[in-house]
A protein has these predicted regions:
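Glycine-rich phosphate/adenosyl-contacting loop at the front of the ribokinase-like
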Residues: 1-56, 64-66
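Short glycine/proline- and charge-enriched loop/turn segments
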Residues: 18-27, 184, 189, 236-240
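Conserved beta-alpha-beta core of the PfkB/ribokinase-like small-molecule kinase fold
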Residues: 131-201
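Residues that scaffold the ATP/ADP-binding catalytic core of kinase and kinase-like folds
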Residues: 14, 103, 173, 191-192, ...
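Short, conserved phosphate/pyrophosphate- and ester-handling motifs at nucleotide-, phospho-/glycolipid
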Residues: 46, 184, 252
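Conserved N-terminal subdomain of the carbohydrate kinase-like
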Residues: 24, 48-129, 299-309
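Conserved phosphate-binding/catalytic region of the ribokinase-like
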Residues: 153, 171, 200-309
Length: 309
């Protein structure tokens, strides 16, 4: 069973323009509205791959109702805690050349009572055989230690956790030893306070240090270059697949979804890595944050050629 947790979901509003003119008039070509937030994107992608998950987190107000309706249409199992505040809207301005400008709202204030309800709900799912995906930002009122707290509690019940967060949410959670993490190059540069762009050799060194700290699997996203997949037993580099890019929004979430889906099904590590890269490539070839079809992923996975490191 896979449970995704989206602490700060959003309606993703993607606006297509030819070229965005700062301070000038922009004519809109097309608008797409999707249920968004990193965990929600993961759940939608798992569904597209043929799997099931339970999407949890916080929803509130008219925007929250709209997201719930969108998830119902997509046949995604949703069990969110209802909050008093209004779920946010994240606006993404997509230009014809692939440039993306994002305007993300802060999200509602979460009360201690609402947070406690969610934690109680998560513990109902916590058991051996359950994968939790903790991803994305948190709203005001939620402590930066929340992911680490959840990891420790569900680990006691035998569950596993894929953590996809950055900044303080990432650093505060490492001591809890999540089973899988997925930082990108920029996040690791921030994590160690680097004053230069890290080389692949340096990234591998940091990844191995994280493994020594007790992390089970470290996936380092390299953007258009692919990703590194590291465990103590094996290390792979999966170069990215060349596809026509429509939107990079949700590409990382697609990788998280596919890798977790594969692990939940008991697939081999290399198979999970290949599935992650193929699904991520499929995601960037779709509009907005819509996941790729399973047929598209099956087509792309044939092109993924892992390199053993």
């Amino acid at each position: 069973m896979i449970v995704t947790v989206t602490m700060n979901p959003a309606i993703d509003k993607t606006i297509d323009v030819e070229t965005f003119v700062h301070g000038g008039l922009n004519r809109v070509k097309h608008i797409i509205m999707d249920a968004g937030g990193k965990g929600i994107n993961v759940s939608k992608t798992i569904k597209a791959l043929g799997g099931d998950s339970i999407a949890t987190g916080f929803l509130g107000g008219n925007n929250g109702n709209a997201i719930a309706n969108m998830l119902a249409i997509d046949e995604v199992n949703a069990e969110f805690v209802t909050v008093d505040g209004e779920t946010r809207i994240n606006t993404k301005i997509a230009e014809a050349d692939g440039t993306l400008t994002e305007l993300n709202e802060a999200g509602p204030e979460i009360s201690e009572e609402e947070l406690s309800k969610l934690e109680d709900q998560l513990m109902q799912y916590a058991k051996e055989g359950t994968w939790f995906v903790l991803s994305g930002s948190v709203s005001s009122g939620v402590p930066k230690t929340i992911y680490g707290d959840i990891i420790r509690k569900v680990h006691e019940k035998g569950a596993k956790v894929f953590l996809d967060a950055d900044g303080e949410l990432f650093t505060q959670s490492l001591a809890a030893k999540p089973d899988v993490i997925k930082p990108n190059r920029e996040e690791l540069e921030k994590y160690i306070g680097a004053d230069h762009s890290l080389t692949e050799e340096e990234l591998l060194h940091i990844g191995n240090e994280l493994l020594e700290q007790g992390i089970g699997t470290v996936i380092i996203s390299l953007g258009h270059e692919g990703a590194l997949f590291l465990t103590k037993e094996q290390s792979l580099k999966c170069p990215a697949i060349s596809v026509e890019v429509h939107s990079t929004v949700g590409a990382g979430d697609a990788l998280v979804a596919a890798f977790t889906y594969g692990m939940d099904k008991g697939e081999d590590f290399e198979v999970c890595a290949r599935l992650g890269i193929a699904t991520s490539a499929g995601a960037v070839s779709t509009e907005g944050t819509k996941p790729p079809t399973r047929d598209k992923v099956d087509e792309l996975i044939q092109l993924v050629k892992p390199i053993k490191l």
